[in-house]
């Protein structure tokens, strides 16, 4: 097979101090891929023709991969995505980051909500982790992990209603996190969220209420997203260790 390159230009360029390029994974649906870049673009590309179908301004640099879900009632695909706080930070290194629900066919913004964040030189705040889509008793929610909100060291996990964009619950975290939230389920379908943070904590939360059910500390910053198989969680830390943890 031949290697195909797709080139593009935007109104934001390196001369405006924006960095061009992509640091997150694409998501795909049918014969389209959806990808974010460092200059605040979310783009839909037809992979059969390599043509740009649409581009949506999502305001800032996105390090989080977009996630896509098809509404079973309508058959319409939607994308959930957010950004870091980078180019849009003010002189005090603070600002609002957006969370979007976007129509995958048209690029239309269905809803948008914002959260105030902090950033420091070289280490931006905002959403650095991919959102978590869920099922069973958690259906109707999407989870975002927000770094450096409520203070430079703090964070927040939020559960958002997918239809309205309203916040269902939020949990303030003493330490910010870059790890993506992961959903796990009991045999009867009750959902829980696992979230790791920059102080080495692994939290287990009730996905319906946000109540923290348990926390263990693994010693060092956890930037990786845990992998879960049956009742075993596996995750690596900045302490050069890989842990296996049993869910009970």
What are these regions (language model features)?
Residues 41, 84-90, 148-152, 200-201, ...:
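Short glycine/acidic-enriched loop and turn motifs that connect beta-strands
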